C-alpha cells in the first residue's frame, strides 16, 4: 500500500480510538443534549438577524432625515506662538476666501474642538455660514442686528485621534484647549483695552464637547462665556472600557455643580438618526447657576430644521449650521451670559413669551366669530411672526389680546416624505400658529394679517385620555384647529416606541400636523427639550423619545404622552389610537446595549470555566469545552436566566435605591424585565457560536501546521521550541521595552501563541482541552485590549505614541505569558486545593460582575479576569 493511504488509514484508526476513549471518560447521559449548543447557535444567529432587521426598519420608519448640502471656500492660517504649548497639536485661524480678507482680528473669538477622529477642517461649514451672514447683514445695513461684531473662528488640530476610546487622549487634548484659550485672547492685544475680548466661546462636536468641558477648571472657566456642543454624549461615555473615562465624566459633573464661574452649556442633539452615540446621553440634567442654566435641544424641535440628523452631518447640515452661525453672531453682541442664553433659546427653542402689541401694524383686518374662549389661528405659508389679535364686543374699544406664536413645518408638496431626504425643509415652508385666550365668547376677534395668505381660525381643545384611544363624540362639523392630547397612562421609556394611528374624516384641506412633545425625566426638566413633528398620512406614526427614562440613568420614569394636532376644520381628526411596539425594543437595544455583547458572553464563558474546574476537582480529568458548554445549556443556563430575571425584578421595584440603576440592563420598569432574559439567552448563543468557530479554526490551523511523520507525532517537548522562543521574545519585550510596548499588545501576541499551541497539541487529551479552554477564554477578552493596541499603533504611525498609566504595567502581562509557558511545557491542572478554591471564588466574582454591572461598568471585568488567569496559572505551574 502506498505511504499516503497507509498514513490516512492509521490516522483514522487513531482518531476513532481517541474518540471512543474520550467518550468512555466523559459519557453523555442524554445524547439529545449534544444538540442544545447547536440549537442555541441557530437561535443566536436568527435573533441577531432579527435585531439587524429591526434596527433597519426603525431607522427607515423614524430615522429618516433631510438636510441641504452646504458649500464654502475655506482657508486656514496656522498660529505660531513663542510660548511652547504642544508639538503634537496645532491651532488654526479660519478665513472664508473672498470675504475674510483682513489679517488682523477684531471680532468675537470662537474655538472649535473636533470630536473622535475629527478634523480641524470640520469648522468650515459653520464658520463659512457665519461669515456670509455677517457680510450680508453689513451690505443690507441691518444695524438693528449687527453691532460691529463678527466671529473669528479658531480650530484645534487634534490629529484626528481616537478620543472616544482613550481617556488619556481626552486629558491631553483638554490641556491643549486650555492653552489655546489663553493664546487666542493674546491675539487681540493690538486692540484698545475696552475692545479686547475677555472670553472665548467654545464650539465642539462629539467627544470634543467632553474635551471642552474637561478643560473648564476654576481658572480657565473664567475665560469662556458659553460652550456649544453638537452630538456630544454628556451623561454616559460611548464605550465603558476604561475606568479613567468614567473618572473624567465624574470630574466634569463635579465641576459643573461646584464651580460658580462654570460657563453654561448648550447641547444640540441629532436624535434617532445619530447611531454613533446614544442620544439619551446628549440630554442634560438641570444645573442652575444664578440665572444661567444648561439647555439641551434635539434638532427635530429646532425651528427651521425639524429633522433628526446623522452624527457627522450635524456639522455640515445647512439648516443647522445656518441657525448655529446666526445664533453665535447674535450672542457675540450681547453684554452678558444671561442675554446670550435668551438669544440661544430664541434661535433653538422658538423661545417666545406672550406678546402684546399695543397698535396694529396693518390696516387690513379679518373678522372671526368666537367659537371658544381658547382659540388657535393657523396662517399657512407665513414665515413671519407679525401677528396682532384684537377682541371687540361692540360696546367698548377693541383691545389687543396676548398671543403665543410659533412657526411649524408646512411643506409645499404634501405628497413628499417629511423630512425630504437631501433637502429638508425650506425657509418658506412654514405656517404660523397663534394661540390666544379670550375673556368671553360673545365677541369678535379681529386679526391684522394683510401680508398673510390663508388664515384658519378654530377652537383649542384639551383631551385627557385614560385609555389608548380617543374618538370624536359629536357628528357635527368640527370647528377645532388645535387638539391637545394627554395619554396619561402611556408607558414611557427610550427603549419603547408607540404606534400612533390617526383616522381622518372627509378631507378637503391639508393633512393634520402632529407634534409629539417628549416629557423629560424629572431631573432633566427645564434643561432638555425634545419634540418631533409628523404629518398624518394614513400609515402608523412611530413615536419615540430620548429624554424619558433610559438605561443606566438615575432618573425616575414618568407616565404620559403629550400630543398636539393642528388641523383644518375641513380635514378633521376623527380618532386617535396609541399602541406599544415592543418589537422595536430590539432596535433601540443596538446602540444602548453595545457593551452587553462584550460583557455577558465573558460571563457565560466564566460559567463554563467554573464548571470545568469543578468537574476536574471531582473526576481528576479536564472536560472538553464544548462538552461543558452542552452541560451548561442543559442545567446551569436556565438557572442563571432565572436568577437574572429575579435580580432585574428586584431592581424594578426599587427605582430610588442608590446606584441600583447601573445593574443588569439599567432599566427600572417592570415591563422591561423580560429583555434581561432575552439578551441572556442571546448572549449564551453568541458564546456557542464563538466557541464552535474557534474550535473549527483550531482544527483547521492544526491541519495546516502539523507535519505527519508516520502514525506517531513528535513529542510535545520537541515541538514546542517555537513556543518557547515566543515566550522568551515576549518576556524580553515585556521587561526590556516596558515603557514602550503596552501590555495589551503582549496579551494579543500571547493569544496567538496559545492558538498555535492548541493547534499543535495532540487532539482529545487533557493538555489539548486545557490549552483550547485557555485559547477560547482569552480570545473573548481581546475586545477589551484591541482598541488600545489600535490607538497605540496609530500613534506610533503618526509619531505621537502615548500610553495610559496602566499600559506599561507588567502585572497585566504576567498571566498570558505564563499561560503560553505552561502550554509550551505541557503543564496541566494540579490539585492544589488552595489555588483551586481561590480560583473558583475569583470565577464566581467574575460571573457576578459580568452579568450585574458588566453592561455599564464594562472596564471592571478586565482586572477581575486578569486575577482569574493568575490563579488559574497558579493551579497549573
Swiss-Prot record:
Which EC number(s) does UniProt give?
A: 3.1.-.-
The membrane topology term of the UniProt record is:
Multi-pass membrane protein
Record Gene3D superfamilies:
alpha/beta hydrolase (3.40.50.1820)
Query: What are the GO cellular component annotations?
Result: endoplasmic reticulum; endoplasmic reticulum membrane
One Pfam family this sequence matches: PGAP1_TMD
Please list which residues make up the signal peptide. none
Reading the lineage from the top rank, the first entry is Eukaryota
Q: What is the purpose of this protein?
A: Involved in inositol deacylation of GPI-anchored proteins which plays important roles in the quality control and ER-associated degradation of GPI-anchored proteins.
Q: Which residues does the entry assign to the active site, renumbered to this chain?
A: 206
Keyword Transport belongs to the record: yes
Gene Ontology biological-process entries: GPI anchor biosynthetic process; protein transport
Kind of enzyme, top EC level?
A: hydrolase
What family does this chain come from, according to its entry?
Answer: Belongs to the GPI inositol-deacylase family.
Annotated protein name in UniProt: GPI inositol-deacylase
| Glycan-linked positions | 291, 336, 374, 448, 473
Bilayer-spanning residue ranges: 35-55, 597-617, 637-657, 674-694, 735-755, 771-791, 809-829, 834-854, 857-877
* Keywords in alphabetical order: Endoplasmic reticulum, Glycoprotein, Hydrolase, Membrane, Protein transport, Transmembrane, Transmembrane helix, Transport
The subcellular localization recorded is: Endoplasmic reticulum membrane
Alphabetical list of InterPro entries matching this protein: AB_hydrolase_fold, PGAP1-ab_dom-like, PGAP1/BST1, PGAP1_TMD
Q: Which organism is it from?
A: Cryptococcus neoformans var. neoformans serotype D (strain JEC21 / ATCC MYA-565) (Filobasidiella neoformans)
Recorded GO molecular functions are:
phosphatidylinositol deacylase activity
